[in-house]
Amino acid sequence: MNECKGMESHLTEFSGLVSKNCIENTTVPHTAYILQVHKNPDQVNRFIDQIISEEQADVFVHIDKKTHNELCRKILNNPNVEVLDENIDVKWGDISQVDATILLLKKVLDKQKSYDFVCLRSGQDLLVKNGFRDFLLNNKNKIFMTATHIERSNSDVAFQNISWPKVARKQYNVFHPFRVFRRIIMRLYGWGFNIFPNPYKLPEEFSLYHGSSWFCIPLNIARYIIDFLERNEWYYDAFKNALCPDEWFFQTIIMNSEYKSQVVNNNLIYLRWDQTFKNRNHPITFTLEDINSIESSDQYFARKFDQNFDNSVIEYFINRIKI
């Protein structure tokens, strides 16, 4: 595992899933999209336009506290779109990413609407393949998230078993002593020395699972997550000083539940990780040159895009793809 690199599954065949051509059903699935946003409101609005066509979806937007006042009035004014008044200062590698997701899930549940799915996406995603509405309709009750079992003996468990100092839970995009410090802590853990032990370890009967932050889950799974957290405060404590807890938190809850069998190891998002030293904890920002790889991925979404880096690739998918 490469620092905070998520295990994004780029599967192109969904084993056991139902093709949209297998079932004819005119019922429209109702989806709650929960978006984490921190920049480019115009681009965010174009993504929202993609996913709320035919009013089959509601969109809940959390704007990072650092840019909330600047962006909140620029998000699309639409009865199907709600910008949360509450905002969290989201930081890389920190529990704040989990906090923002929990806040969004609670907002969806507070609506008391019968959504079929709750899909967590970022403001730099785009829909890149037609037919997502029919795909959801024909795959109800499936949980779309990446989840890889990590044995307790694996050194990557250091992400959760260490109570990471704040300086190690920050993002450094250049060579920095604290980046080296983080590597040293990981190496020592692998040798059996945990110099910052987490006092809130998970029970031994809990299996650890790692994957991407992004998911698409049925409403009852969202309710299960919130109910579980309210009944088991110790679980949150076990991750509050972990490194990149958003890549473990929800997978571990679900994969230790009775709903484990519903998980499809695919979050329906295509991305590619940057291989440079400076940006290797980030997915690359797509350009027009990436269109072939995006389309051949057979995923419904892709990230990340940036209108200030290459707007033409955004135009390409906006003009061709509908929900």
Language model segments and positions:
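ER/Golgi luminal nucleotide-sugar-dependent glycosyltransferases, focusing on the catalytic module
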Residues: 3-323
